């Protein structure tokens, strides 16, 4: 059911969203031009804001904030502004309170995307000080730089599971590394595989790995370029097994995707939320639609 059951008006533009479950309640984390908003959405029809963290940089120039959580802490980055910071917030006591435990630009100022491999306590900061920087979170409130990657112009986004990092490298395609040996500065990851030539190859923007690790859904951020499903069961022989789109407009752009079970959730720039059944990855079918322009 794609009926809208709750909403919240705010006098600024929203950008990124994230979600956490804490103390038997569910929370939505949403970025805006002013900072980070945390909503209790346990009952989505009566959601309400429980906390707000002002950004280090605010105003209409803020287009990108990004989030990930680990060990009861929320990690916040922003891709705009010379006064931006890395913010770490203790959210373990939600909905009652939060506590900003770190707010500084010592490690990074701007950063486009952040992803945490929770199984290995490593934070991947995309397009920050280098193409991508990796930090140890052995102490969650004191990240320690353990690796900087400059093998490409920049890494736009990353998906990491158990030290296997799927890196979206813009016009330089997809690269997959193993970071299990990277624990301190000087250590080097192992390149497992890469894909630079494929149908509708453009600006390799984002992707998500299936629960079983066999499939990878990938989006190139170009007008009219299809979503791709990749067979990554053998990273030495990555293959595109299907391509598809929303069917709305030949110039539409698929932005970000998340896989949950057999469903692929795609946010489009103009076509809203689209959900595809990928139980047959060779023949995905569109099953749910929500028009965010309504």
Question: Predicted regions span which residues?
Answer:
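Feature marking well-ordered beta-strand scaffolds used for ligand recognition
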Residues: 1-294
